[in-house]
Amino acid sequence: MAPTQPRDAQRSRVYRAETPLGGRRLPTLPDCAAFRDDVVGSLWWVARFPDHDLAKAPILRPGNGARQAFYREDPGHPTITLPRRYRTVGVVLHELVHWALADAHDLPNHGRTFTRILLDATAEFMGSAKRERLAAAYIEHKVHVGPPPRVGPAGGYDYGWDERLRLGRGRRFLVDYDADASAQGTLLSRAHRKVTLADGEARHVIPERTIWRVRGSGNGRTAR
């Protein structure tokens, strides 16, 4: 059974921070689709989310009568609903980040991992000035942002490593570190820049600076 998704505590603050920023308008759904394809087909996106490619990209829906834009896992294919007033590059990016994290059920929908990815994507696809405005708005509205992703030996990016460790005490993880080492166990502590996992009687103490990927393992929380 997958772990229960954490409470989406900063959702409203994220919305308040993003709303004034605007962004280039995309008047029609084909315009939105062209921007979606530019993002998902870019080297930047492929390097970070190789399993989320153009063939699997969300279908765009007009949202006639809908009051807001939203991402949804519909049967057979994900969708993004875009009412006319929400057809901007900023909104499309926001919803694409939800798609990138669709399988991350152990992370909040608008948590630190989400805001870090959106901040990085804003810099890449909307420019550094817009990125700085978004970063300032996050600070103003007390939105928490995760640290940069860790990059593994093969060049893969892990954005969720920090938030998983932050929220995951008592959960089982598979932690990859150094060039080719890994350890599995229940997270006991994260202190003094070290992560401690328990696997039966064994204890794994891993320097945090060496970690490049953290994945859930087993069946969620251990029995208490």
Segments and roles (model prediction):
Residues R7-T81, D103-R213:
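Metalloprotease/metallohydrolase-associated module, dominated by Zn2+-dependent proteases
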Residues G90-D103:
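Active-site recognition of the HExxH zinc-binding catalytic motif
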Residues H94-L96, A129, T210-W212, N219-T222:
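Surface-exposed beta-strand edges and their flanking turn/coil or helix-capping segments
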Residues M1, R166-L167, S217-R224:
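Short intrinsically disordered terminal tails
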Residues R84-V89:
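Secondary-structure capping and boundary motifs in well-ordered enzyme cores
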